[in-house]
Curated annotation (Swiss-Prot):
PROSITE patterns to which the protein is assigned, alphabetical: CRIB (PS50108)
Originating organism: Saccharomyces cerevisiae (strain ATCC 204508 / S288c)
Domain of life, per lineage: Eukaryota
Keywords: Cell shape, Cytoplasm, Cytoskeleton
DNA damage keyword on record: no
Name of encoding gene: GIC1
Keyword Glycoprotein: no
The name this protein goes by in its record: GTPase-interacting component 1
Positions of the CRIB domain: 126-139
Cellular component terms (Gene Ontology): cell cortex; cellular bud neck; cellular bud tip; cytoplasm; cytoskeleton; incipient cellular bud site; mating projection tip; nucleus
Length: 314
């Protein structure tokens, strides 16, 4: 038997591994008898020994290909966090950060529920930056929150009274900002009825003179600026009708003379040239409406001069 097995091994081709897909190739290599043994499987122990001697391993067979023929029981896989302590610490830190970030938005809601709607608490959201207040110019009344505390009302009233009863030469730039900060809704929206850009100085006067050498502004005396109703009634406006109209008025009243002295007419030198004055024979010493030269007279004079002054032919 042993000699026959050896002869059979010698007849088989010597190769390390081969894949056989078709029956014809198997018949060519191993012959019909070997094919019968592959398909039917071993029947006796001697045949199994023969297969082992040949070194043939069937892929779909029930025989175990490993040398040990017992299943090895492996322990369960450990948790990946216990293997590396750094992974465990990083995971805990990430979870804590996430909880703290989400808890930041829940604490404000819990506080507002405990203390009720009377306590004004800022409700932050993800879309608004930190400590952000929106200034609204739409309305100065608190329409969103009708229930406001008595202390805030008292502060606003005292602030308005102070600004109205005690004016300063220059407006306080912080008054509007203080007022807007006091009037605030629960939705962190500042309702402002006035801003710094819209404030005006009520004490500004256009009759202010330039700065003196000492650096102080010198205003006109109150007597020069005061004007009574009698002065307005007795004041005669200038006209171009002639001296007859001016003689009809009553120049003897001291109030008229004092009031009219403030409004001096322009000098005649500013209205015409000396040539124009000689043409019309105007006496500059007289200061009456009849001596005044109108714009039409000036234009007419220059128009006549341009017509008469023609170039001479030599």
């Amino acid at each position: 038997m042993t000699e026959g097995k050896r002869l059979q091994q010698m007849e088989l081709p010597q190769m390390k591994s081969i894949w056989i897909d078709e029956d014809q190739e198997m018949e060519k290599l191993y012959g019909f008898q070997v094919r019968q043994r592959f398909m039917n499987g071993p029947s006796t122990d001697s045949d199994e020994d023969a297969d082992e001697d040949l070194g043939i391993v069937l892929v779909d067979s029930k025989k175990l290909a490993l040398p040990n023929k017992n299943n090895i029981k492996l322990p369960p896989l450990p948790n990946y966090m216990t293997i590396n302590p750094n992974i465990n610490s990083n995971h805990k830190s990430l979870t804590n950060k996430k909880k703290n970030f989400l808890g930041m938005f829940k604490k404000k809601d819990l506080l507002s529920r405990r203390h009720g709607s009377a306590k004004t608490a800022k409700q932050s959201s993800i879309s608004t930056p930190f400590d952000f207040h929106h200034i609204s110019h739409a309305n100065g009344k608190r329409e969103d929150n009708p229930l406001e505390s008595h202390e805030e009302k008292h502060d606003v009233e005292s602030l308005v009274k102070f600004t109205s009863l005690a004016p300063q030469p220059r407006p306080d730039s912080n008054v509007s900002s203080k007022y807007s900060n006091v009037v605030m809704n629960d939705s962190s929206r500042i309702v402002s009825s006035s801003t710094i850009a819209t404030t005006m100085d009520s004490h500004h006067d256009g009759n202010e003179t330039n700065n003196t050498p000492n650096g102080n502004k010198q205003l006109d005396s109150p007597t020069d600026l005061e004007m009574t109703l009698e002065d307005l009634r007795n004041y005669t406006f200038p006209s171009v009708l002639g001296d007859s109209v001016s003689e009809k008025t009553n120049p003897s009243s001291p109030s008229v003379s004092s009031f009219s002295g403030k409004f001096k007419p322009r000098e005649l030198s500013a209205l015409h040239t000396p040539e124009l004055g000689n043409c019309f024979n105007v006496d500059q010493s007289l200061n009456s409406p009849g001596n005044r030269i109108s714009v039409d007279d000036v234009l007419k004079f220059y128009y006549q001069c341009s017509e008469t002054s023609t170039p001479r032919n030599t």
